[in-house]
Structure formats: structure tokens, C-alpha cells
């Protein structure tokens, strides 16, 4: 089964919300936790308890674990494994991007079932060229895992690069979406969602066209950054059933109380229901 189909199945019962696990320093402090490995472990444990049975897609931000070295990665491994064991799909927000054997190494780290960091999906950067990511696409195809390619992100700095156009007037972000769509096309022809998704900001005034993507859309920018449910639907258009808005800040702000975080998840998820599956 493709990652896209797994995600649609999960969303049919849990909704289309993606919740981030972002244990940055100020949040650890606001939770009354020490800014060290112990604080990281407790933060992650609370997030697992709050999200594992309620959310379709959870997105740990790898950088906040990586900063603590091997001990941080050990906590990330446990977090990913526990979430997946309890029925969540996990996208590791690593934003990796390289070429050749190095990219293959990143692919194995995040998508190979034998890896201790094995996730359902991973975020990647296409800056070195879309097909520099072929090793991760190939492993995703082999194991039914997902890849989210950065396409049109919500940070203002992105516009100077992602909005640049080629000689035919097609923006870089649109080219990325179109190339992802080409990889998903065989599945879309069968009425299925493919393995290759894109990252599209929910606050964009001129987003790329997504009507032929045929894969999942990870949409940061909802909530604290100003994006709304109507923005998500408008940008995603015909692919709205595959749009998964990422909400992190407002939900994590209700921690460390697990019940409060669950309540916040329920309130946010109500705006993004899943669709019944036959």
C-alpha cells in the first residue's frame, strides 16, 4: 500500500491534522522542564501520550533532537517507534538533501524498515535538483513510505527563490509540484494516492497548482502563523482530501497537561475532517 493510501485511511478516522513535536528551548522552559536530555525525554513522552491515539500524522522536528547528539537521537528513535506502534503515521522533519550515495544514506536512515529511525515519511529539500532525490523516492516506492518535498514554503524568505520562473514562465515551486505529480501519476490513474507529497505553506497568496499532484500535501502555517481552514481548502482545491495542515505551536502551548493537549487536538482537528473510505 502506498503512503498516500495509508494516510487517507488514517485520516478517515482521525482527521487530516498533522501535529508537530517541536521541543525547542523556550517551550521546554515554559513547560517547566530542564533544557537538557531529561527535559527532551519528558517533553517527548507527554507528546506521545497526547497524540498517539488521536492524530493521523505526527511530525517530530529532528533538529531539536539532533542538538543533543546521540542521546537526543536515542529519544527520537523511541518517540518514532512508540508513535508508530500505537497507530500514528510519523513524518520525520529532517529536510535532508544531497546527491548519490549520500542521499541514499539519508534515505536508508529515515525510510528503511531496518533503521532505528525508520519513519513513515521524511521531508526533503530539492535544492540540488529534484532528481538528486531519486534514492529516497526509490526507497519510498520499495517500502510504501512517503516523501514530502519542499515546494512552496510559508517562510517569507522563500519567495526570492521558489517564485523564480523558467523561460516558459513556470515557477520553481510549480516545477517541483509537477515533477512530484509525474511520480504519482501511475497511482493516480488507478484512483489511488501515491508516495510523493509536497510541502506547501497555508499562508501563500500565489500557491502552485496542485490539481494533478496525486499525493499528500503537508501545509505548515495554520494557526499561530495566520493560516485558516478556508486557506487550506482554497490552496489544495481538488486535492483537499490529501491536505494535512500542520498545527504545532497552539497545541504545544497547552502542555504539559496531556488532557489539555488532547482537547486542543480535538478542537483543531474538527476543522479538518477526513473522508470516508470504501
UniProtKB/Swiss-Prot annotation:
GO BP, one annotated term: 'de novo' pyrimidine nucleobase biosynthetic process
Keyword Lyase: yes
Reaction equations catalysed: orotidine 5'-phosphate + H(+) = UMP + CO2
Pathway named in the protein's UniProt entry: Pyrimidine metabolism; UMP biosynthesis via de novo pathway; UMP from orotate: step 2/2
InterPro entries noted in UniProt: Aldolase_TIM, OMPdecase_AS, OMPdecase_type-2, OMPdeCOase_dom, RibuloseP-bd_barrel
Keyword Cell division: no
Residues annotated as the enzyme's active site: 95
Catalytic activity, EC: 4.1.1.23
Keyword annotations from UniProtKB, A to Z: Decarboxylase, Lyase, Pyrimidine biosynthesis
Entry GO MF terms: orotidine-5'-phosphate decarboxylase activity
Pfam families: OMPdecase
Family: Belongs to the OMP decarboxylase family. Type 2 subfamily.
PANTHER family named among the record's database cross-references: OROTIDINE 5'-PHOSPHATE DECARBOXYLASE
NCBIfam families from the UniProt entry: pyrF_sub2
Protein name in UniProt: Orotidine 5'-phosphate decarboxylase
